[in-house]
């Protein structure tokens, strides 16, 4: 009889872990889909909306820990660097959103390149 609660506890941990990992993947999918929209659109309302979605996904993903860093302490250099990457990304998204709100599409397009550079740098480390 004692085995049932133990087994139930193990399964709930596994399910929670799988859900958490899916959430990080969902955030990454939101980021990449909306980056494509920002890259190709010239409509400031569409760009601003996509950037807001990107910002929310980045904030959510920043709280997660990718599989490559599982088991690392919260204050480890790797976790701090992972979260710093999202700080840089969010900062760049905010700058890009400001340019979109000002109607400066040329700066928006330049900024997309910087977002891609940040993504590539941190993907190579933690993906």
From Swiss-Prot:
Keyword Kinase among UniProt keywords: no
Family indicated by similarity: Belongs to the cytochrome b562 family.
Tagged with keyword Iron: yes
GO function terms (MF aspect): electron transfer activity; heme binding; iron ion binding
Xref: SUPFAM superfamilies: Cytochromes (SSF47175)
Subcellular location: Periplasm
Gene that encodes it: cybC1
The species this protein was found in: Yersinia pestis
Cofactor: binding details: Binds 1 heme b (iron(II)-protoporphyrin IX) group per molecule.
Protein name from the UniProt record: Probable soluble cytochrome b562 1
Binding site for heme b: 28, 123
Cofactor requirement: heme b
């Amino acid at each position: 009889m004692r085995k049932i609660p133990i087994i139930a506890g193990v399964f709930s941990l596994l399910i929670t872990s799988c859900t958490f990992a899916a959430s990080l993947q969902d955030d990454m999918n939101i980021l990449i889909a909306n980056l494509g929209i920002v890259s190709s659109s010239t409509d400031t309302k569409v760009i601003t909306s996509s950037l807001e979605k990107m910002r929310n996904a980045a904030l959510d993903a920043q709280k997660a820990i990718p599989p490559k860093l599982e088991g690392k302490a919260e204050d480890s250099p790797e976790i701090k660097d992972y979260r710093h990457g999202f700080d840089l990304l969010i900062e760049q998204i905010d700058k890009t959103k400001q340019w979109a709100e000002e109607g400066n599409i040329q700066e928006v397009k330049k900024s997309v390149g910087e977002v891609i550079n940040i993504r590539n740098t941190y993907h190579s480390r933690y993906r």
